[in-house]
């Protein structure tokens, strides 16, 4: 028999009760997490979002409530009234927040039963993730996911409070916008009223937040959903959330200072971690030189060492020919890894090949010196010079790649991260921030045979480099900056172009005709002609930030209703087909598959 809630009101959450509540009458509501029948007394662990309380059903005290407890099973929904009591001596559970008390039931309502669960909620390590996503409403009852999402809510509240205190105004920008596909593909929304025309869901509020600066709002922020129709991986979703900010009459230093304060507030209050300010900075060129990537993980060493000048005249033609042909040779010293087996080194070689390396040379440092197939090609002086460059000691393993600069940096940069994970060097409880600055403004796209924006087309060049935008584009640096945490880019921003003629020049450099630029971005170009202030901003990926704060392996563990890597919601069965009438109203006819 199912009971109605009636006029019952909850007095406490299950996780709130402590020794100080002993003797109080309470009303609790929640789910049966566990039920134990001791041949008379029935013990139920009653769970809600705040925690668990042990509930005791005694047939002598309340036979009616005891009968309901006998029929209850896991995930049944109960409401109980009772008295908080101290647990008997020897039964206190110090691992539980409520472990010193129990509630002696005087009344019970069985509000709803539950079917048998497709998986248990107290440890689902071996449960297929697709099953968890199909039954997401059950998955979300687990403590870890609930804690993740409640912490996410706290981070959002901290963000709003901090930015509001610093003069930012929270404003919404449109979700139905114009398609300007310059990067990832847009999600398109057909217009019923304007048949044959489409809105696009925004990949970011970029243009609208710049226009808000033109409009004089000075400081804007928004915690906003964005959409990209792209191939997915563990830290990507088709819909994602950004902490989006823009400021007027500022330079890079102003933005960095304010945003460092935001990160310090979030990590102190949400994670109990002090962020040392100011955050370390590194130019793009330094990051590539030392770590091979522009998002370096600074929790460990394994820095790259440039060896080109040492080996360019050596007897090892593989290295010498690469350097003399315009390539480079770099290596890294994997400290204490000299005992690594040949198979393990072969596995590292195959990993490096994924990123374009043709091979991976190695040297094991022994008491006798170099142990390596390439040792015979180098003079003692060359070996000594390389040993010094590597700070090589007995027991170390030296790894080398020779190729074009991009291949060398990509392969060794990724190999560095791979080795750190393999060797346990990435402590999830250590948080190392670094700002990466002075990015290139443009990069040459070999496939398209044109220049492409490294960040986006609205990023301003350095003042001193503006003169080279047409004559020497590869020389230009951008007023761009990324915030990297433990090897993950968590935020990216720039000072924007605020002059129409410079923005038009940038579009021209990206291969857009004047007509095409006007068609796609005419409203921005028009706005820039009406007294646009210098401005800039940044956007933080909230999903990725929460993944790092919580130590999760995937952003799917910090999003309430994520999609799969194929962009599907297994719970609601989206995306799905629509009926013919809806398509006719939109003027759409589907092509045959």
Swiss-Prot record:
Instruction: Name the reaction it catalyses.
Output: tRNA(Asx) + L-aspartate + ATP = L-aspartyl-tRNA(Asx) + AMP + diphosphate
| InterPro entries per UniProt | Aa-tRNA-synt_II (IPR004364), aa-tRNA-synth_II (IPR006195), aa-tRNA-synth_II/BPL/LPL (IPR045864), Asp-tRNA-ligase_1 (IPR004524), Asp-tRNA-ligase_1_N (IPR047089), Asp/Asn-tRNA-synth_IIb (IPR002312), AspRS_core (IPR047090), GAD-like_sf (IPR004115)
Alphabetical list of PROSITE patterns matching this protein? AA_TRNA_LIGASE_II
**Signal peptide: which range, if any?**
none
Q: Name one GO cellular component term.
A: cytoplasm
Could you tell me what this protein does? Aspartyl-tRNA synthetase with relaxed tRNA specificity since it is able to aspartylate not only its cognate tRNA(Asp) but also tRNA(Asn). Reaction proceeds in two steps: L-aspartate is first activated by ATP to form Asp-AMP and then transferred to the acceptor end of tRNA(Asp/Asn).
| Complex formation | Homodimer.
Name of this protein: Aspartate--tRNA(Asp/Asn) ligase
């Amino acid at each position: 028999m199912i009971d109605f809630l009636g006029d019952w009101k909850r007095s406490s959450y299950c996780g709130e009760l402590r020794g100080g509540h002993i003797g109080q009458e309470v009303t609790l509501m929640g789910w049966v997490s566990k039920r134990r029948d001791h041949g008379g007394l029935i013990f139920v662990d009653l769970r809600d979002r705040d925690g668990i309380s042990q509930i005791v059903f005694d047939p002598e005290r309340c036979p009616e409530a005891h009968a309901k407890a006998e029929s209850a099973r896991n995930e049944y929904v109960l409401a109980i009234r009772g008295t908080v009591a101290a647990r008997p001596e020897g039964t206190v559970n110090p691992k539980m927040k409520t472990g010193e008390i129990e509630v002696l039931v005087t009344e019970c309502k069985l509000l709803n039963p539950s079917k048998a669960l497709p998986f248990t909620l107290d440890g689902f390590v071996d449960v297929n993730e697709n099953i968890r996503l199909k039954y997401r409403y059950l998955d979300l009852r687990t403590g870890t996911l609930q804690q993740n999402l409640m912490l996410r809510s706290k981070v959002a509240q901290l963000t709003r409070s901090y930015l509001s205190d610093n003069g930012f105004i929270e404003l919404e920008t449109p979700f139905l916008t114009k398609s300007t596909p310059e990067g990832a593909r847009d999600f398109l929304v057909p217009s019923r009223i304007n048949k044959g025309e489409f809105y696009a869901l925004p990949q970011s509020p970029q243009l609208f937040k710049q226009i808000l600066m033109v409009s004089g709002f000075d400081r804007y922020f928004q915690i906003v959903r964005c959409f990209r129709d792209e191939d997915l991986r563990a830290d990507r979703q088709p819909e994602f959330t950004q902490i989006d900010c823009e400021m007027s009459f500022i330079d890079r230093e102003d933005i960095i200072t304010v945003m460092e304060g935001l990160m310090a507030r979030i990590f102190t209050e949400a994670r109990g971690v002090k962020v040392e300010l100011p955050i370390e900075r590194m130019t793009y060129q330094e990051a590539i030189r030392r770590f091979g990537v522009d998002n370096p993980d600074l929790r460990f060493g394994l820095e790259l060492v440039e060896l080109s000048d040492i080996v360019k005249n050596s007897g090892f033609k593989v290295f010498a020919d690469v350097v003399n042909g315009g390539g480079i040779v770099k290596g890294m010293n994997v400290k204490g890894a000299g005992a690594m087996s040949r198979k393990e080194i072969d596995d590292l070689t195959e990993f490096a090949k994924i990123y374009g390396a043709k091979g991976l040379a190695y040297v094991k440092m022994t008491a006798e010196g170099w142990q390596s197939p390439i040792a015979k090609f180098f003079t003692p002086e060359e070996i000594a010079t390389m040993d010094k460059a590597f700070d090589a000691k007995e027991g170390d393993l030296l790894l080398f790649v020779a190729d074009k600069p991009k291949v060398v940096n990509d392969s060794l940069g990724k190999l560095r991260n791979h080795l750190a994970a393999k060797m346990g060097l990435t402590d999830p409880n250590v948080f190392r921030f670094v700002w990466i600055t002075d990015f290139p403004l443009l990069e040459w796209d070999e496939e398209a045979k044109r220049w492409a924006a490294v960040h986006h087309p609205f990023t301003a060049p350095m003042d001193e480099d503006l003169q080279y935008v047409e004559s020497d584009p590869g020389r230009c640096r951008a007023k761009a900056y990324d915030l990297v945490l433990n090897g993950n880019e968590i935020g990216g921003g720039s000072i924007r172009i605020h002059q129409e003629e410079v923005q038009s020049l940038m579009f021209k450099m990206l291969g857009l005709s004047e007509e095409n630029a006007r068609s796609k971005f005419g409203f921005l170009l028009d706005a820039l002609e009406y007294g646009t202030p210098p401005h800039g901003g940044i956007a933080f990926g909230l999903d990725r930030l929460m993944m790092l704060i919580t130590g999760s392996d995937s952003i799917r563990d910090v999003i309430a209703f994520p999609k799969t890597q194929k962009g599907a919601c297994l719970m609601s069965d989206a995306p799905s087909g629509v009926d013919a009438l809806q398509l006719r109203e939109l003027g759409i006819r589907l092509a045959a598959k």
